[in-house]
Amino acid sequence: MAELTIDPASIRKALDDFVSSYKPSDTPTQEVGYVATAGDGIAHVTGLPGCMANELLTFEDGTLGLAFNLDAREIGVVILGDFAGIEEGQEVRRTGEVLSVPVGDGYLGRVVDPLGKPIDGLGEIQNIEGRRILEAQAPDVMHRHPVDEPLSTGLKAIDAMTPIGRGQRQLIIGDRQTGKTAIAIDTIINQKANWESGDPKKQVRCIYVAIGQKGSTIASVKQSLEDAGAMEYTTIVASPAADSAGFKYIAPYTGSAIGQHWMYNGKHVLIVFDDLSKQAEAYRSISLLLRRPPGREAYPGDVFYLHSRLLERCAKVSDDLGGGSMTGLPIVETKANDVSAYIPTNVISITDGQIFLQSDLFNANQRPAVDVGISVSRVGGAAQTKALKKVSGTLKISLAQYRSLESFAMFASDLDAASKAQLTRGAHLTELLKQPQFHPYSPEQEVVSVWTGTHGKLDDLDLKDVLPFEQGLLDYIDHNTDILKTIRETEEFTADTEAALDKAVDEFRSTFVSGSGKPLEEKKVESVKAAPVDQEKIVAGEK
C-alpha cells in the first residue's frame, strides 16, 4: 500500500485554483422584517436595517406601506390601503423604490386612486408615458417665468377683481357650504372652449383632487363635469372619507405628479386640491399615531412644509423647459369665518392670493359669495387681458367703499346726493356680480358686463331687473354688433370700441321692458362725485 503524503504546495495550488474560479451564487438576497404591531393604518416593523426614508415596503398580502419613521429598533410604516389583513408577525419586505405613479395623456377622462390605479370601471389606463415620483422637487427660481398669462374662471367677480394667472397659486377659503367647490368646478368647465380650439398654447388639462369627501359628493362632481363635457380633459384623483389616512396624505402629491409631467412637456395644467384641511388632518393623525411631537392645534411641527412643498410645484416654467404651467387652486375650510387659524394662515402665506367666501353673503343669496375686502390676487393686472384690466380698474374700490358706506348708512337719517348715488351704484354692481353655477362668461362678455355696471348704465334699474337687462344686452350685442368679436380678437378695449358699446347700450335700453312691464325712462345718471361744499371766505383785515 502506497504511503499517503501531504504536499503543502499541492494544497495551496488547489485552493488558489478554487478561489480564482469561484463565482458567487445568483440567488438574490433580500432583507426581511416582521410586523411588531399594526392598527389604525399604522404598522411598527422590526428588522430591515437598510430601509430608507419614504421607501416603499410590501406586506404579505401585497399591501404597500411607506417608511415614515426610522427609529433605532423599529420602523414606523404608513399603510397605503386596507390594513385589516395585516397582523403581528407577518413578513415585510423592502422594494428599494420610492413612491411613484404612472403619468401620461391616458389619465384624461379617468378617475384614479392615490396610487394611480383606475377606480371608474373603464379598464386599465392606456397611453402611459412613464412614471414620476411623488416627492418631486419644485422648479427653482431660475427655471420659472413670471405669471403674465390669464387663466379665465368665467366668473365675473373673480376675473375682474381677483384675477388668476397661469402658474399662480390662488387659495379658495371659506366656511363649509359657501360655494368653494362650485368655483373650482366652474373654472374647470370654463376651460372647455380652450380645449375645443385645438391650440396647445390655449388648452388646459385639469386635475381635480378630492380629499376626504363623501363618495357621493365625488360622484356628483364627476357627473357635473360629464354633463358639461369637461371630463374629456379632466382627471379626478379620489381619496374619499372611507380611505385610510395614508391615502388622504399622498393624494395631492399624486395629482401634482401627474400635472408636473404635462407642465414639463410644455402644456398648461389646472389642479384643484379639495381640500387641504382634510389632508392636514390626515397627516396629523398619522403623526400622532407614530408618536411625533405635537405642536399648535396638535399638528406636527412640519405641517407648513407639508403644504409648501406641494404648492411650490405650481409654477409657470421658463421657455427653456417648454414654457408650460401648472395653476393651483387649493381649497381650505374655515370654522366660523376664522382665517387666523393655523392651517388657513399657513396656506395664505404660501399662495399668491386668496378668494375668501363669506357665509353671510352666501346666505344673503350673493353667489359667488366673494368678500371683496379680504380677497386679493398678488399677481393682479398681470393676469388680466388689457380690455378687462381697463374696465375693472375702479370696480373693487367702488365695492369696498360701498360696503363701508352701507354700514354707516344704517345709522344715518339723511345722506347727501353723492352718498345716495354711491349706494345705488354699489347695490347695482353687487347685483351684477351674481352668477348662477355652471354658467361661465367669456372674457369679452365680462368686459361688456363690467363696463356697463361701472359706467352707471344700470343705476336707474330696479335691482331685480339688473341680471335680465345684462343677459338681454349681451344677446343684443352678440347678434347686432361686432363688439364681442373685436374684444375677443384684439383683447383690447379701444375708444372706438367703447363708443360703439355706449351706443349699443343706449339702443338696447330703448327696447328693454322692465319686470313691471314698463319701458325704461331716460334718466340722467347721477354723478358719484362729492358735491362741492360752500365755505365762508375770510378776507384779511375784515372785521
From Swiss-Prot:
GO cellular component, one term: proton-transporting ATP synthase complex
Membrane topology: Peripheral membrane protein
PROSITE patterns: ATPASE_ALPHA_BETA (PS00152)
UniProt entry tagged with the keyword GTP-binding: no
Annotated ATP binding sites: G174, D175, R176, Q177, T178, G179, K180, T181
Pfam families membership: ATP-synt_ab, ATP-synt_ab_C, ATP-synt_ab_N
Site (Required for activity) residue list: S375
InterPro entries in the cross-refs: ATP_synth_asu-like_sf (IPR023366), ATP_synth_asu_C (IPR000793), ATP_synth_asu_C_sf (IPR038376), ATP_synth_F1_a_nt-bd_dom (IPR033732), ATP_synth_F1_asu (IPR005294), ATPase_a/bsu_AS (IPR020003), ATPase_F1/V1/A1_a/bsu_N (IPR004100), ATPase_F1/V1/A1_a/bsu_N_sf (IPR036121)
Catalytic activities: ATP + H2O + 4 H(+)(in) = ADP + phosphate + 5 H(+)(out)
EC numbers, comma separated: 7.1.2.2
Location of the protein in the cell: Cell membrane
Keywords: ATP synthesis, ATP-binding, Cell membrane, CF(1), Hydrogen ion transport, Ion transport, Membrane, Nucleotide-binding, Translocase, Transport
Top-level class of the enzyme under EC nomenclature: translocase
Molecular-function GO terms, alphabetical: ADP binding; ATP binding; proton-transporting ATP synthase activity, rotational mechanism
Family label: Belongs to the ATPase alpha/beta chains family.
Subunit annotation: F-type ATPases have 2 components, CF(1) - the catalytic core - and CF(0) - the membrane proton channel. CF(1) has five subunits: alpha(3), beta(3), gamma(1), delta(1), epsilon(1). CF(0) has three main subunits: a(1), b(2) and c(9-12). The alpha and beta chains form an alternating ring which encloses part of the gamma chain. CF(1) is attached to CF(0) by a central stalk formed by the gamma and epsilon chains, while a peripheral stalk is formed by the delta and b chains.
Function: Produces ATP from ADP in the presence of a proton gradient across the membrane. The alpha chain is a regulatory subunit.
Entry protein name: ATP synthase subunit alpha
Lineage of the species this protein comes from: Bacteria, Bacillati, Actinomycetota, Actinomycetes, Bifidobacteriales
